[in-house]
Amino acid sequence: MARNKTNNDKNIANDEASTVLARVLPSNVQAEQMLLGAILTNNELLNYVSEFLRSEHFFEPIHQKIYNGIEVITEKGLIATPITLRSMLANDELFHEMEGAEYLAKLVTMSMMVINPIDYGKIIYDLAIKRYLINIGEEVVNDAYNSSLEFEAKEQIERAESKLYDLASEGINEKSFTKIAIPISESIASINRAMKNNDHVIGISTGLIDLDSKLFGFHNSDLVILAGRPAMGKTAFALNLALNACNNMLIKNKRDNEEVQSVGFFSLEMSSEQLTTRLLSMSAGIDSTTLRTGMINEANYNRLRKEAIALSELSFFIDDTPALTISAIRTRARRMKRKHNLGILFVDYLQLIRGVSKSDNRVNEVSEITQGLKAIAKELNIPVIALSQLSRAVELREDKRPMLSDLRESGSIEQDADIVMFIYREEYYLSRKEPAASDPKHAEKYAEWQDNMSKAHNITDIIIAKHRSGPVGNVQLFYDSQYSKFVNLETKYPVHPR
């Protein structure tokens, strides 16, 4: 009985699929003919539709060739007429099959009935989008039936969602020229906000005063690269920045009566539990080893619970899915922007992201990833902070302070980033250079080493190596490794370690 029902369901599904495939794709050949004829009669009309209409939007192949020919001719500063088009398409096989010269004359004749050519352009565009939508639907169905595909169902859904979003955005959200008065008004508003703020931070505050004085906060549409060698504290620093940003956005949103903005954190390496343990450690002031082992007294536990409740109420979202593609990250970020008003995005880390296109060249793949991250920042109008590894070349030289050339697969990373920051802890490298006891000058060298260690103790350098809209330079922070916490170094600031 159950088997018969299953077979019936399959038969119904197959019949429905056959019906869908048998349908004629939506098109309006007459609208295409009338628009092309109107443009051939008056080339100025091309300016009104070329902003959203492309040759591939036409259904008939001959119309695609004619529209493309008109664009090529007019771009050269010439006039597109049946005569100039006939000369251009003289060797085209399809043009000859359609008796092109007579067909062009027919189009011009039909244009006499055109009242508003822009309306015809919109009809052609709308029908093309519907055909693309049908193609996406067929791809989704075929992929779902194909069990040999390497993609899991969830990833197929994300791929479909990404294609649908791209289709929805096509031609509609494309930017064109904007009268200068609009961006000037936005700039003045931004300057006014900065004047009202005592700290003159016009972006999302990092919560670290000296760093804010260099960056002026994190800015919408910026791609920020935070790079460092292993054990420098990249993830810990990113978590500090994310938590500070979350708290500072909440304060601003409440003050200005705005919708609460969220922090998104993609963790491709560590689990969400590992990240939240670190967040609890830095918030409660209890080292993470104590938290993991459970060796905690009642007073600390009560403080921990209080901080856990406070953190739980924040609009802070973690996605710890490993090996995400840049396309999946874009899809999930879009979804979060829509559902939770995403205000800033962190990605840990860049080298663990997979490109969409299959490429044996890692440099090209990283270029695709960094361009994708920058596109997310611009599209969603948020800062994107991406962590990055540095090459081993750092370890091979005496001076371990990072440089732009140390970025792994560095060309595109440096080019696409608005800000490149390096995190560097001299103490880490000094601790591995303790003078050997067998050295004849051990006492002298040991005293010098101890002095250097004392100066570098708990100090982290944030090296701003590239800043598209501001100064570069070095900022020193106090790093409490016990609690994975970064705070202002100077005692003159409200939050400091002394």
Curated annotation (Swiss-Prot):
Its EC number is: 5.6.2.3
List the PROSITE patterns hit by this protein, alphabetically: SF4_HELICASE (PS51199)
Q: Which residues bind ATP?
A: 228-235
Query: Is Lyase among the key words of this record?
Result: no
Residues annotated as domain SF4 helicase: 197-493
Q: Which reaction does it catalyse?
A: Couples ATP hydrolysis with the unwinding of duplex DNA at the replication fork by translocating in the 5'-3' direction. This creates two antiparallel DNA single strands (ssDNA). The leading ssDNA polymer is the template for DNA polymerase III holoenzyme which synthesizes a continuous strand; ATP + H2O = ADP + phosphate + H(+)
Is-annotated flag, keyword Lipoprotein? no
Q: Which UniProt keywords apply?
A: ATP-binding, DNA replication, DNA-binding, Helicase, Hydrolase, Isomerase, Nucleotide-binding, Primosome
**GO CC terms of this entry:** cytosol; primosome complex
Q: What class of enzyme is it?
A: isomerase
Q: Which GO terms describe its biological process?
A: DNA replication, synthesis of primer
Q: Which GO terms describe its molecular function?
A: ATP binding; ATP hydrolysis activity; DNA binding; DNA helicase activity
Sum up the protein's function in the record's words.
The main replicative DNA helicase, it participates in initiation and elongation during chromosome replication. Travels ahead of the DNA replisome, separating dsDNA into templates for DNA synthesis. A processive ATP-dependent 5'-3' DNA helicase it has DNA-dependent ATPase activity.
Q: How does it assemble?
A: Homohexamer.
The UniProt family comment states:
Belongs to the helicase family. DnaB subfamily.
Identification of the protein by name: Replicative DNA helicase DnaB
Organism listed in the record: Rickettsia bellii (strain RML369-C)
What gene is it encoded by? dnaB
